[in-house]
Amino acid sequence: MTDFFDCERAQVYHNTGKLSPAQIRNRTGCTHIINGYLFNSKFQPVGWTVIDGKIISRDAYQDWGISIGTDGLPKMLTDRGGSFLSGIPIIKGGSKLYRDLTPDVARSAARTAVGWLPNGKICLWCDKTALTREQLQNKLLGLGVEDALMLDGGGSTQGIFPKGKVTSSRKVPTLLLFWERKTENPTPAPVKPEEPALAWGKAKGLVTDAQLAEPERAVTRQELVETLRRFSAINWKTEGG
């Protein structure tokens, strides 16, 4: 399951209540939700987890992760000042990256990943299809992704998008929430009030609705003759002829 969208804001969610993605989505109103990074047997996140400047977990590495600053936009950076969640960098600038992986992470497994397109849109990958890191990199590059982070996978892979979901019975301590930017409908052009002369002409039957719709259009000779004919008929009735 993949989706591409213009992201308005994102959030790192610390799931202390062991809620399901559906419960979290219902509480927050996010449009997309996916599982976060790795965790230990005590349900504690590993790597860096920072929420609004508060450090939940940390390690010795200063690698790229999902960084969310004051503008609320998720970016692949090393800045841990706002909110931050570790991930395994697998693509940067359109090139594959390789970090040392433990055997349980390196094996072929279901995958969750976040990617960025050159136009700034987000690409989310959340799928039960078993892939190696190399296969996931190839899939994402084929979709046009230029930066990407791999998150927890295997039995942790789970997410909900507007048009689909991937479920798991496993609860995870961190999740990533996204809000898709709403498409704004263009404001219709204001209706220009009729000029007094045109309004009078319409009331007298001298101007048709079609002519009023294009008040700046030049009048043809035929239309001019028709207008004069109607005007003459009105005068004849008024004068009692």
Can you say where each PLM-predicted feature lies in the sequence?
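Short, solvent-exposed alpha-helical surface patches in non-cytosolic proteins
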Residues: 186-241
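Gly/Ser/Thr/Pro-rich low-complexity, intrinsically disordered segments
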Residues: 1-185
